[in-house]
Amino acid sequence: MVDTKKEQERDELHRAIWAIADELRGAVDGWDFKNYVLGTMFYRYISENLCNYINSGEIEAGNTDFDFAEMLDEDAEEARDGLVEEKGFFILPSELFCNVRAKAADDENLNETLERVFRHIEESAKGSEAENDFAGLFDDYDVNSNKLGATVAKRNEKLVKLLNGVGDMNLGDVKDHSIDAFGDAYEYLMTMYASNAGKSGGEFFTPADVSELLTRLGTVGKTEINKVYDPACGSGSLLLKAESILGKDAIRNGFYGQEINITTYNLCRINMFLHDVGFDKFNIACEDTLISPQHWDDEPFELIVSNLPYSIKWAGDENPLLINDPRFAPAGVLAPKSKADMAFIMHSLSWLASNGTAAIVCFPGIMYRGGAEKKIRQYLIDNSYVDCIIQLPNNLFFGTSIATCIMVMKKNKTDNKVLFIDATNECVKVTNNNKLTPENIEHIVDIFAKREEILHFSHLANYEEVVENDYNLSVSTYVEAEDTREKIDIVKLNAEIKEIVAREQVLRDEIDKIIAEIEGNI
């Protein structure tokens, strides 16, 4: 049951956070400014997280008045190695968010101070298992950018406002509240930035309702999974949805993803930390997934979820090595150079565990286009890998109104049937976008789990039917849309027409009579 009061408090907090973030940016474009707000939030979080970790240990040991933030740097240095091993990073007391913020207004070199602090945080992880997780995390936080101001003084003025604005966000105290408050606020801000950014926002963020549906589809009947993977992970929100649905300890061996855009890659790693995912529980890489996959040693994955980039270009047959790549070779053909969608599908299938499920948002064209894409569909169907195709409503995503599909794949199917679901109308309109409600999601997942046939909504097609349709996997080929046009009673209509014609004749006769009388009087 939904806690209405808690939801209201959450909404109020979100509105307050967005008001602060929006006020902070001033005349700077929100999309450009997001890295500063989100980066500052991350700096605050890891500072408070480290303090809480150290203080809790000291209090348990009986040192009830201890506060790491008040220690001298030289005394704190003694604990550096142990803390890096346990937490993955270290921050000197003088460089904690609270202490830098307290002196910020009087620091004429605040830009240099922050630059040094961020460099020290990243360097603290060097040589440890967390090195790759922290390397370059603050690269997009340019304290000397003209976006912050034309002069050093103006830039520092903006940085002071940033520290105070994020410091004033009511995210609770880590020791008294769920640290997910930070993660929740971060997700909310990313949603707002993405919705205001149009196309570029849609490229890095999957709306929460779509993430929920994908993850629910991929975890039907499961209470835990070994690993979750996203080959185009964006800001990581879709990866993290598995934890919110199954529970914190239900992802036994962690989160894996790859992202080609370095700014988005940094946002993803920050997102992991803000959701209290330990550095040893996630592995996010920044590379081209199709050409340079980074998780050969980590696959297979029990859950694969992704909102793929739509019909982007890739090397394809220009690279002679790819046709022999074990991910693509089984289909005997490569996805077209101009449309990489099916390459991502084959990559995901290759890395899917035998007991796993892949739920992937796809561009609808891959369901019916000919050529190489048809041959790959044939391979998928002939080998019984396609479990379900779901047609989604249009306008669900930021920056595009296109109606996408979900392809669900499994390797352990016991039949060669494919369930087709037409969820075109499973949504409500919210401002400029459509949205899947909890009821919409529940309905789709319920029919998916039961593999149930419902007139005008779902159809379970056998192998022969798909072959007869030339391996076309468009939902409209198998699920007839309901005719919502008004049904016409022909007999009643003819009677009405006959009555109108008769009435018309009566009126004509009366008009003729009037005209005759007028002419007779002339």
Predicted feature descriptions by range:
Residues 23, 165, 169, 188, ...:
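Conserved, well-folded catalytic cores of nucleic-acid-processing
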Residues 37, 182, 225, 252, ...:
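A structure-centric signal for secondary-structure junctions around beta-strands
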Residues 200-306, 311-313, 317-322, 327-332, ...:
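Conserved S-adenosyl-L-methionine
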